[in-house]
Amino acid sequence: MAKIDFDRSKEHVNIGTIGHVDHGKTTLTAAIATVLAKHVEGNEARDYGSIDNAPEERERGITINTSHIEYNTEKRHYAHVDCPGHADYVKNMITGAAQMDGAILVVAATDGPMPQTREHILLSKQVGVPKMVVFLNKVDLLGSGSEAEEMADLVEFEIRDLLSQYEFDGENTPVVRGSALKALNGEKAWEDKVMELMSQVDNWIDAPLREVDKPFLMAVEDVFTITGRGTVATGKVERGELKINEEVDIVGYTEKPKRTTVTGIEMFRKNLKTALAGDNAGLLLRGINREQIERGQVLAKPGTIVPHTKFKAAIYALKKEEGGRHTPFFKNYKPQFYFRTTDVTGGIELPNNIEMVTPGDNVDLIVDLISPIAVEVGTKFSIREGGRTVGAGSVTEIVK
């Protein structure tokens, strides 16, 4: 575990890059860290390779796993997650976006909004990202002059329209035009655009009201072992606070929770005395083997949440144009349901008066999962099938 204590003097905000594959999300992430390192103390420059760090990614040139970095503006400390852009990895987008208080939507001016741009905006709405700032990337490739300006204006108009369709504030959302690659390469005019972007992020994206007074809950994103110390579970603290030596329940996948004591807490390799709502924390768990905890379970204040398999839900079935199904689904349909950091297969029961659900429908139905999961009223989820998002929903009532 870490040696240095974490500094909490600045307001902490979780943010991330989203958008279509190859529009420049990872390059922009590297540019933000690198440009801020020149202007604000306490930042470390990053290159593309250090963020695009999973082996599969570089072989295929596509970002797969979510990558976490940190940086500071004059006003705030940010934890930044670089979200996957490739359609096959929307599953990871769901776990990554669930960690965001706001997003930077990256759109290449050369392409305009693409299918994954739309899907990421929809998913951001679904997982509760309240606001986003748009970075219109690669504007240098449009050339100069009035035609280039008109092209950029047109793309900006399309993006604003798309944001409004999904109930974001398309009219007032800040749009910054720039070149992530040229900023990363140190060209002053483009570096200034990155600073302008971060100023907009500071001002447009609100610091979240952290739910510190509610019972502690953290969804497990990853688990690893520290030799001689024990097992560490990492994830974003959804609500509440946790102090060292307090007990937590490991909930999900089994009928009964398993209880353990937290003997160490860290964030970005620095020690914490307390983990608070909004923190990306690593918790050292006493007496727990690597096999006794897995991604998708949650750590919670003892007795505050129990696993369930059956619940009522309000769902929206995506239209074909939104990347959803082309045909209706009927009772006994068995897709995957994605909660926080987990996916589990479940069957559906339709109300008596409904025979089928057509793409574009809003409907109330009952979900019956094959494994018990920590859910409660208000828990949001996505419905996936064959590698694509086909619906989005929210738990309205627990059945069992």
From Swiss-Prot:
<keyword id="KW-0547">Nucleotide-binding</keyword>
<dbReference type="GO" id="GO:0005829">
    <property type="term" value="C:cytosol"/>
</dbReference>
<protein>
    <recommendedName>
        <fullName>Elongation factor Tu</fullName>
        <ecNumber>3.6.5.3</ecNumber>
    </recommendedName>
</protein>
<dbReference type="GO" id="GO:0003924">
    <property type="term" value="F:GTPase activity"/>
</dbReference>
<dbReference type="InterPro" id="IPR005225">
    <property type="entry name" value="Small_GTP-bd"/>
</dbReference>
<feature type="binding site">
    <location>
        <begin position="137"/>
        <end position="140"/>
    </location>
    <ligand>
        <name>GTP</name>
    </ligand>
</feature>
<dbReference type="GO" id="GO:0005525">
    <property type="term" value="F:GTP binding"/>
</dbReference>
<feature type="binding site">
    <location>
        <begin position="82"/>
        <end position="86"/>
    </location>
    <ligand>
        <name>GTP</name>
    </ligand>
</feature>
<feature type="region of interest" description="G4">
    <location>
        <begin position="137"/>
        <end position="140"/>
    </location>
</feature>
<dbReference type="InterPro" id="IPR027417">
    <property type="entry name" value="P-loop_NTPase"/>
</dbReference>
<comment type="function">
    <text>GTP hydrolase that promotes the GTP-dependent binding of aminoacyl-tRNA to the A-site of ribosomes during protein biosynthesis.</text>
</comment>
<dbReference type="InterPro" id="IPR000795">
    <property type="entry name" value="T_Tr_GTP-bd_dom"/>
</dbReference>
<feature type="binding site">
    <location>
        <begin position="19"/>
        <end position="26"/>
    </location>
    <ligand>
        <name>GTP</name>
    </ligand>
</feature>
<dbReference type="InterPro" id="IPR033720">
    <property type="entry name" value="EFTU_2"/>
</dbReference>
<dbReference type="InterPro" id="IPR004541">
    <property type="entry name" value="Transl_elong_EFTu/EF1A_bac/org"/>
</dbReference>
<dbReference type="InterPro" id="IPR004160">
    <property type="entry name" value="Transl_elong_EFTu/EF1A_C"/>
</dbReference>
<dbReference type="GO" id="GO:0003746">
    <property type="term" value="F:translation elongation factor activity"/>
</dbReference>
<dbReference type="InterPro" id="IPR004161">
    <property type="entry name" value="EFTu-like_2"/>
</dbReference>
<dbReference type="InterPro" id="IPR031157">
    <property type="entry name" value="G_TR_CS"/>
</dbReference>
<feature type="region of interest" description="G1">
    <location>
        <begin position="19"/>
        <end position="26"/>
    </location>
</feature>
<comment type="similarity">
    <text>Belongs to the TRAFAC class translation factor GTPase superfamily. Classic translation factor GTPase family. EF-Tu/EF-1A subfamily.</text>
</comment>
<keyword id="KW-0342">GTP-binding</keyword>
<keyword id="KW-0648">Protein biosynthesis</keyword>
<dbReference type="Pfam" id="PF03143">
    <property type="entry name" value="GTP_EFTU_D3"/>
</dbReference>
<keyword id="KW-0460">Magnesium</keyword>
<feature type="region of interest" description="G5">
    <location>
        <begin position="179"/>
        <end position="181"/>
    </location>
</feature>
<keyword id="KW-0251">Elongation factor</keyword>
<dbReference type="Pfam" id="PF03144">
    <property type="entry name" value="GTP_EFTU_D2"/>
</dbReference>
<dbReference type="InterPro" id="IPR050055">
    <property type="entry name" value="EF-Tu_GTPase"/>
</dbReference>
<dbReference type="Pfam" id="PF00009">
    <property type="entry name" value="GTP_EFTU"/>
</dbReference>
<dbReference type="InterPro" id="IPR041709">
    <property type="entry name" value="EF-Tu_GTP-bd"/>
</dbReference>
<feature type="region of interest" description="G3">
    <location>
        <begin position="82"/>
        <end position="85"/>
    </location>
</feature>
<feature type="binding site">
    <location>
        <position position="26"/>
    </location>
    <ligand>
        <name>Mg(2+)</name>
    </ligand>
</feature>
<feature type="region of interest" description="G2">
    <location>
        <begin position="61"/>
        <end position="65"/>
    </location>
</feature>
<keyword id="KW-0479">Metal-binding</keyword>
<keyword id="KW-0963">Cytoplasm</keyword>
<dbReference type="InterPro" id="IPR009001">
    <property type="entry name" value="Transl_elong_EF1A/Init_IF2_C"/>
</dbReference>
<feature type="domain" description="tr-type G">
    <location>
        <begin position="10"/>
        <end position="209"/>
    </location>
</feature>
<dbReference type="InterPro" id="IPR009000">
    <property type="entry name" value="Transl_B-barrel_sf"/>
</dbReference>
<keyword id="KW-0378">Hydrolase</keyword>
<comment type="subunit">
    <text>Monomer.</text>
</comment>
